[in-house]
Amino acid sequence: FFHAEDGIRDQPRSRGLGDVYKRQVTHDSYEAFYLGSKCGIILNQELKQFDDPYKVYHFPNSVEVVNFLNRGILIPAKVTGENTLENWDLGTIEGNFMKPYPKGSNVQLLLQPEDLEHDDKSNLKLEVVDRKFRGTNFIYTLKTNSNLLIPVFVHSHHIHQHEVDEKFGIKRPINIDHIVCF
């Protein structure tokens, strides 16, 4: 669901709010992110999050919103410091936590396709299980040793493409600008 402020402001005053929302509602999050100045996620008749599209995407406030958006995965991790956590398959992940967690906390880390960077020279290699062309980029689905499936974007101008069953390097250290955990 999205809200375009200009669209609402420009509607004739004689129309009711329900009429405006009929024209301004979508179930496609890509469309909502593109068109909306504000996005609201309504699940089970309850408003779960309402904010600008950037914040809804990058800072979802619940696992329900993460699952609804379906733009990343939650992986198990352990908080090891003020700006670090560990995942069994990926190793150390650095960044800025959006909420504080005590050292030693077990959390679910949100990994979005743009969070990991490809690096052919890296010693962290994951198996390619799928590759989809998306115009400006490819989205690779990579399998970890513990069978997690992780989506990763790679610019479509990348020198070479990786095929299914090939190994795919992930740049280390892993640094995520904003670490979202639950």
What residue spans do the PLM features occupy?
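Internal alpha/beta loop-helix hairpins
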Residues: K22-G91
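A generic local structural motif
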Residues: E5-R9, H27, E94-N96, S156
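Short, solvent-exposed secondary-structure boundary motifs
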Residues: F1-H3, E64-N70, D119, R131
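Non-catalytic connector elements of ABC transporters
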Residues: G72, E82-F182
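Single conserved hydrophobic/aromatic residue that forms the stacking wall/gate
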Residues: F1-Y21
